[in-house]
Amino acid sequence: MRKIIHVDMDCFFAAVEMRDNPALRDIPLAIGGSRERRGVISTANYPARKYGVRSAMPTAMALKLCPHLTLLPGRFDAYKEASAHIREIFSRYTSLIEPLSLDEAYLDVTHSPHCYGSATLMAKEIRQTIFDELQLTASAGIAPIKFLAKIASDLNKPNGQYVITPEEVPGFLRTLPLGKIPGVGKVTAAKLESLGLRTCEDVQKSDLAALLKRFGKFGRVLWERSQGIDDREISSDRQRKSVGVERTLAEDIHEWAECEAIVELLYPELERRLAAVQPDLRIARQGVKLKFNDFQLTTQEHVWPKLNKEDLLATARKTWEERRSGRGVRLVGLHVTLLDPQIERQLVLGL
């Protein structure tokens, strides 16, 4: 049985700003683009969240909800420096680390000798070390299954942790709302509920063939997660084939300007992850992914040896205009595929 820890920093970008400027600690604060440039919120602190401000929300909407919101453009060098320090702390416990973004990662500590082999104690020690060395708080989830560790990390936020033992998995899944499964947003959850599927137990009782017919590949993923099946390995840097970043949206978008703002938000994150790749790796292809409100997924990519925002924006617009067919979009993603000239095969760095 595996021991997986998911560590998620608490409102990371905003937390770095509050650490470096204590005057920001108790006021609504968000990191994001300006309203005039149709910006999008990247991160909001907890005082801002009380007003309903959330990540991926248009800045204009955030300012309507919280007119006195303090908006900062972000200091990504500072966030990257803190993220590298956090990653080094993880490496003291295991080499099996899969970063999902600058502020969260999976750790496989199944064979780690630290803390007498206790994943619970390791998570507690990691969180305390992060606070001692960076004055930032983290939350953690511990479970034998990858996606359950991610769900668990959100159950005792901020600055807490939650454990799902192997014996607790069946009972936990039985009552788990489908909207808690990573990748199942509010719109999808509402559609599933309209079909009588509200919890994992409802899906457990469903026919897999019927789910596949209605939802395609998503139906299989939904069925497997509801059964507690998630065999995905922790992908360390040397195993990864691509760099990508994506965002599942709280509400479907129907205007190109909204999609353009999401691409603008995601691009700096893609740049940062690409910069972490070994220098002998170069780009083979880059592309865009859109998921529509009928669960269909489309990707479009082409050969392009250098990362370029304008090229990705053009690809996104072409995909939007040619393949959307009036449908709402619930997920936007950017990715590059990497080529290793030394061994002539693709390697990965996932998000």
Curated annotation (Swiss-Prot):
Residues bound to Mg(2+): D8, D103
One GO location term (cellular component): cytosol
CDD domains, sorted: PolY_Pol_IV_kappa
InterPro entries: DNA/RNA_pol_sf, DNA_pol_Y-fam_lit_finger_sf, DNA_pol_Y-fam_little_finger, DNA_polymerase-Y, DNApol_IV, IMS_HHH_1, Rev_trsase/Diguanyl_cyclase, UmuC
Cofactor binding, note field: Binds 2 magnesium ions per subunit.
Pfam families, per the entry: IMS, IMS_C, IMS_HHH_1
Cofactor(s) needed for function: Mg(2+)
Active site: E104
Catalysed reactions, semicolon-separated: DNA(n) + a 2'-deoxyribonucleoside 5'-triphosphate = DNA(n+1) + diphosphate
Annotated keywords: Cytoplasm, DNA damage, DNA repair, DNA replication, DNA-binding, DNA-directed DNA polymerase, Magnesium, Metal-binding, Mutator protein, Nucleotidyltransferase, Transferase
UniProt enzyme class: transferase
Biological processes, Gene Ontology terms: DNA-templated DNA replication; error-prone translesion synthesis; SOS response
Residue ranges occupied by any UmuC domain in the UniProt entry: 4-185
Assembly behavior: Monomer.
HAMAP family: DNApol_IV
Name of the protein in its database record: DNA polymerase IV
